[in-house]
Structure formats: C-alpha cells, structure tokens
C-alpha cells in the first residue's frame, strides 16, 4: 500500500477530525435520501410505511458501517471498499466491486443534481420543466436536457479540487443551514399534519388503504430503494487517509452520522406522510408538494425548496469527494492508468480523478431521467456493502500462509446461499402455512450455520484498536439484510448490474491484470498476506504523522 501510494507523488494532508466526519456523513446522506428517493419510494412502493423502510435500511446501513469502521481504523488509507476487499479477496474482486461502486457514485450524483433542479424551481416558484427542454428522437428517460444539473456538478467539482479542508468548511455551513430546514419540516409536519393520512389515501376508490398499503413486500422494496440514502457514510470512510486520529475519529464519524441520519429520516418520513396522503405525494419534490397540499401553507413549500437545495448540495459535495478518492486509490494499484492517482502538490487533492468523474457525472446528469438513475444505483450499493461484510469475516478468520481459507470461504458461501433461499421463498412462494414453515426452517438453518462456524473455526486476528462486536454475528446479519434487499429489486436492475460487471471484467482482463502494481515480473499476481498489509498500512500512517 505504501508503495502504491508513492505513485500519487504527494500525500493527502491529515486535516479532518471526528466532527468533520459527522458533518460530512450527515451532509452526504440527508440530501440524497430524504429529498430525492423518499417521494418515489412512498408513492410507488411503500406508502406511509416508508418510515419502516427507512428504519430497516438504517439498521442495515449501521451494521455495514461497523464493518467499514473496523477496516478504516486498521487500514487508514483512501479507497474504502476497494482497499478492504483488495487485501482480503484479491485484486479481481476488488476491481469488480470498485468499478460498480464508482458507477453508483456517478449515477447517484447525477440523480441528486437533477433533483436539485426540481427543488430549486420549487424554492423560487418556477416549474423545473421550464429549465429542462425535450429533445425529440431520443428515447424516453433520456430526452430531457437539464443544464442546471450540469452547472451544479461542475461548480462542486471545482470546490473539491480546491481542497479537502475547504470543502469540509463549505459542507459544515451548508449542513447547518440544512439541519435548520429539516427541523422546520419535522415540526411543521407534526403540527399541521393529519394522523388519518397515515392510513387513508386521497383516492380510496383507486388506491389501497392502511399503514401498509402494499404489504410487507412494499416495505422491503421501499427499503431497497431508500438504501441509496446511506451511501454518504461510505464516502466518509474513503477519507480515512485525511483523518488526524483514525482510531478515535472514524468510529464516531461513521457510526454517529448513520445513527443521527436514520432518526432524521424516520421523523421526516412520518412528517411527510401526515401532511399528505401517499397517493397524492409528488415523487420528484415530495416535501414541497406536501406543504402545497396543506391549506394556507403554500409558502412553506418555497422554504422547503430552499432547505432541500442546501441538502442536495451537501450530499453532492460529500459524494463527489468520495468518488474521487476511490478512483485515486484504484489508480495507485495500477488497474486503471496511474494518471487518476495524481495528488496536486498545492491542494493535496486527487485533482485528476475529481475533474474526470465530475465531467462524467455532468454528462449523465445532462440527459438521464431521475427514475432511470435511481434504479441503477441501489443494486450496486447493496452488492458493495455485502462484499465488505464478507471481507471483514475473512480478514478475522484467515491468515494466508498460516491458516487454510477454505473453512471460512465455505461458510461465507453456505450462509449467502441460505440467505438467498430465504429471500427467494419470501418473494416467490404464495402466502400460507407452507411459506411460513419454509421461512422458519431456512432461518433456523442459517442460525445453525453461523453457530457451527463460531464453535469450530477460531479467529486468527483480534483487532487491537477497534473491532466489530459479536463476531461473526454482526457482519452475518449485515450479509443477510443486504441479500434480502437485493432480492427486492426488479429484474432490469440485475440486467444493468450484469452489463456493468461484464464491462469491468473485460477491462480487467484486457488491461488491468497486466498493468497492476500487484503483478510479478512474469505477469502473474502475487498473493498478499492480510495481516502484513494491515501492518504495512499502520507503519505508513505513523510515518505520515511524524512528517
């Protein structure tokens, strides 16, 4: 890792503290989640039970955050999931994961920037359709040109190229303003809202009633979509190389921001559902639309539009910081051109990665519809979190050259298969006693698999600084929830995921495997010892502190 870092030419400065990370985490998550995905998930998938969807997604994110935190504390370098998976499952798995995660970042940032156009229009009382124009001849979903979204992406790109500390200060200001608007929305929603809207649609003759109008399936489908809301904490972990005290600051920053944001999401979801029946919610601007539907409070929709605009800007800022650092570390490894890993000597930022991905994001935001982008994002995010949880278990129980990996790999495969069987039974088997029996039997089998592994296979690495509690139960629950939410997504999402993964495999075979910094002189790949790499990264961290 230290050898790879030298490719960048300069080190990133360690300037961030725990409060910076909490601010970056909150800023990165809240804007994208509440103001972009909530309307779609509530109107089309979950109804008022969207609050339960957020709670489930929040639990899943918190468990995944624990896994990220342990890795980030013991491997305090930029790169997040790519770095963690690279030192456990190897470069190929890391490349496929990293490629999908970067695509997730780019598409989610494009989606957020298009959401900014809708809320900015609400804030100043101008329909966003007046700022977008339709190009005939292009397919639906790709025929609305959004120049405002492009301008926002390019402006944020300039800010993150200027400096990380400066970006954090901008984020703190925007996040503080945003939180004030969030409190306004929550208070006004509970004050002006009608609890009957939690169970009664606006048009009961056309839409189902009740708090769970689409049943349990709708709750989990909604949870899968709003999981995009939590991608912000992952961006925080990518900045581990710029944190002053990773052991203390990263656990507080990552876990604290996820917990705070989950509470905010649930409160805002209840507030929105009380203000307006779910079938009358505007999918593109749900909170502004909810206040418009409240008699005498149309003015509040403009206030919400301003607050949402601040939130979307902070989300975009943090996510674009994260995507650039992923690309920087992937460039260090050599699997993509090392040009991407260049650190500017004056700003200490990965300027090439920031500029390239900023332009790529702007290009997608120019013409791609919000719904298309949201469906593309969720599956890749869930896959990456699933891989990190597996990698953490592997790193705790396997030391290459000392212990055999097959017992742990067999357990991970068997538990994933059991989780998949449970998911398929839940999704495909008709309701009834046979379904209940199969679900219970599968759950018992999954618990038995974990318990047998816990009793038979000893841990070979005990974390010295910070570790996930209740190993291997905590990451296993994370694995199960990620698999379950993956099963809630639609078929086209898997087609797109397969396409992107196929392209990534092709790039790896034709270029990356030969150019990698892991490649030996004969072109083969050397195998890294996990503990050795963790030790090497700690030595690098100490050297940076001495400088």
What feature does the model see in each segment?
Residues 1-39, 43-51, 61-66, 77-78, ...:
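Membrane-interface "cap" regions at the ends of multi-pass membrane proteins
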Residues 12-13, 34-137, 257-263, 497-500:
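Extracellular loop-to-transmembrane helix junctions
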Residues 38, 77, 100-118, 225, ...:
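Membrane-helix boundary/coupling elements in multi-pass transport proteins
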Residues 83-84, 89-90, 122-133, 205-214, ...:
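TM-loop-TM module centered on a large, flexible mid-protein loop between adjacent transmembrane helices
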Residues 118-125, 176-206, 269-276, 385-399, ...:
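Hydrophobic alpha-helical segments and their helix-loop junctions in multi-pass secondary transporters
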Residues 141-150, 244-265, 269, 277, ...:
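Loop-to-transmembrane helix boundary motifs in multi-pass membrane proteins
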Residues 144-202, 254-258, 374-388, 404-411, ...:
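Membrane-interface loop-to-helix entry segments
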Residues 409-547:
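A generic transmembrane alpha-helix motif of multi-pass inner-membrane proteins
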